[in-house]
């Protein structure tokens, strides 16, 4: 599988290789975070009335959460990666 990359806003990059998600420039992360699907927890908040959405991903074995705040349009572009990550998490459990 090729690495997928999605630029979110003007400062956040999300990459996915089918096993590991990597987030650079997230709101609640220092630098970048790499999390393998086998130990990941994912939460997606759909856009609110103002069009603001959010996703968070963390290693289930620690409490450091990586939070990405984004627009509804960015969420739509990121949706294929998040759906694949959710499927990989479900398969790993």
Question: Where do the protein language model's features map onto the residues?
Answer:
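Acidic, Ser/Thr- and proline-rich intrinsically disordered linker/docking segments
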Residues: 1-10, 27-93
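Polybasic phosphoinositide-binding surfaces of eukaryotic membrane-targeting domains
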Residues: 9-24
């Amino acid at each position: 599988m090729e690495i997928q990359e999605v630029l979110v806003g003007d400062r956040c990059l999300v990459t996915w290789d089918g096993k590991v998600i990597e987030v650079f420039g997230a709101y609640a992360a220092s630098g970048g975070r790499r999390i393998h699907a086998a130990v990941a927890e994912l939460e997606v908040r759909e856009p609110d009335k103002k069009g603001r959405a959010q996703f968070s991903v963390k290693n289930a074995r620690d409490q450091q959460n990586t939070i990405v705040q984004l627009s509804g349009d960015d969420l739509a572009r990121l949706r294929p990666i998040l759906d694949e990550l959710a499927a990989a998490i479900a398969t790993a459990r």
